[in-house]
Amino acid sequence: MAVARAALGPLVTGLYDVQAFKFGDFVLKSGLSSPIYIDLRGIVSRPRLLSQVADILFQTAQNAGISFDTVCGVPYTALPLATVICSTNQIPMLIRRKETKDYGTKRLVEGTINPGETCLIIEDVVTSGSSVLETVEVLQKEGLKVTDAIVLLDREQGGKDKLQAHGIRLHSVCTLSKMLEILEQQKKVDAETVGRVKRFIQENVFVAANHNGSPLSIKEAPKELSFGARAELPRIHPVASKLLRLMQKKETNLCLSADVSLARELLQLADALGPSICMLKTHVDILNDFTLDVMKELITLAKCHEFLIFEDRKFADIGNTVKKQYEGGIFKIASWADLVNAHVVPGSGVVKGLQEVGLPLHRGCLLIAEMSSTGSLATGDYTRAAVRMAEEHSEFVVGFISGSRVSMKPEFLHLTPGVQLEAGGDNLGQQYNSPQEVIGKRGSDIIIVGRGIISAADRLEAAEMYRKAAWEAYLSRLGV
């Protein structure tokens, strides 16, 4: 490792000079608030620094005596690093996609694959090791062997132990502690900042697990932010904050889909099940006897039982049209619905039109990023476009209708329809997942349940079963 040590000081300095290390208060992918954020994506615009990083990564692999046939960079920041390594040293490279394309070869791994060969993984930063493991699994499914990974910076938060538990040796050019030591010696950061970051590292270490799932005896895993903590985030939308607070208070992340055709039944459901839910979803255009007086009664019940009203209108027209649909017509949705939703097909105009009406009334909007029906086209690039649109209009958009967590920003809510206690489907293409799958594994926040409650002999009992299942899945996700 002599070459790596000799080059470490200038390398850390170079990365600091291009603002790869940021100190302050940052929300990480996990939802944790961190005093440091590491972003190496900018080095692609600095060829000399890119080559310097690639060279030291390759030298680290050589010094470790690793034998390998191909190289694969973890998408996306490590891809250019792997490219430079392979081009400079004439080594075959493989590219792992994050998702399968709907056209062409539809392969997850591009390049010449020879089953039985060993592939070396390149990564820029390792925290928990999850991204490396995802790449390992994809490569192993192609018949390749993976034994080692080279990383530029190990954040020392359990990633090395987690990878070791899965049979992967992690070799780092530099640890976060060493990087801080160098920056402090160069007087680029002060002792107080170094201490704060080191305390954060020590207090937030991910638990490793063996192949059988049993935890190894290392420090406690970090918890993601609770609903209550997310409600207090400085950039949280007021409607999202209100919803998260009442969810925490009532211990419910259940939204009732009240798809009934009579106003009397709608109000009965709201009154009887209101204490069990955080939100009531309406399809107001299927009410046979709709009046604005009915919605006034619903607002009264919502205030009494502390739940929000969500009109599942699915706006999908040009801005001027949705604006009129939202504020006018016989439904006057903006006058009573806390939240509405919209498709992103028309482009940002649909959000801008709704926003003109909703912002002054302190309303919010959910974008449809994924759908729970068979053959839905709301996948891939469509979903990513929905996330970008939400980020660009976060003053009005509070989250998503989706089958899983599509944004790692804790300010955004994720609501998932198509939930039943047992997975399955119907004869019209609806697919159902369990609360544990949706909340515990896919990272959603709120389950939307309709027929599982409406069709039950005892609706209150059914609602409580769903509430408890969803809340327990949420607590399990927190590690409580």
UniProtKB/Swiss-Prot annotation:
- The UniProt annotation puts the region (OMPdecase) at 221-480
Q: Known consequence of changing G429R?
A: In ORAC1; increased OPRT activity; reduced ODC activity; reduced OPRT and ODC activities
Q: Which residues form the active site?
A: D312, K314, D317
Residues annotated as carrying N-acetylalanine in the record are A2
State its Enzyme Commission number(s).
Answer: 2.4.2.10, 4.1.1.23
SUPFAM superfamilies for the chain:
PRTase-like, Ribulose-phoshate binding barrel
GO biological process annotation, one example:
UDP biosynthetic process
Which pathway is this protein engaged in?
Answer: Pyrimidine metabolism; UMP biosynthesis via de novo pathway; UMP from orotate: step 1/2; Pyrimidine metabolism; UMP biosynthesis via de novo pathway; UMP from orotate: step 2/2
What does the UniProt keyword field contain?
Answer: Acetylation, Decarboxylase, Disease variant, Glycosyltransferase, Lyase, Multifunctional enzyme, Phosphoprotein, Pyrimidine biosynthesis, Transferase
Query: Mutating V109G leads to what result?
Result: In ORAC1; reduced OPRT activity; reduced ODC activity
Annotated GO MF terms: identical protein binding; orotate phosphoribosyltransferase activity; orotidine-5'-phosphate decarboxylase activity
Q: Where does UMP bind?
A: S257, D259, K281, T282, H283, D317, T321, S372, Q430, Q431, Y432, G450, R451
Q: Which GO terms describe its cellular component?
A: cytoplasm; cytosol; nucleus
Q: Which residues carry this modification: Phosphoserine?
A: S214
**Binding-site list for orotidine 5'-phosphate:** S257, K281, K314, D317, T321, S372, Q430, Q431, Y432, G450, R451
Summary of the function given for this chain in its UniProt record: Bifunctional enzyme catalyzing the last two steps of de novo pyrimidine biosynthesis, orotate phosphoribosyltransferase (OPRT), which converts orotate to orotidine-5'-monophosphate (OMP), and orotidine-5'-monophosphate decarboxylase (ODC), the terminal enzymatic reaction that decarboxylates OMP to uridine monophosphate (UMP).
HAMAP family attached to this UniProt entry: PyrE
Q: How does it assemble?
A: Homodimer; dimerization is required for enzymatic activity.
Q: What family, per the record? A: In the N-terminal section; belongs to the purine/pyrimidine phosphoribosyltransferase family. In the C-terminal section; belongs to the OMP decarboxylase family.
Matching PANTHER family, A to Z? OROTATE PHOSPHORIBOSYLTRANSFERASE, URIDINE 5'-MONOPHOSPHATE SYNTHASE
Protein name per the record: Uridine 5'-monophosphate synthase
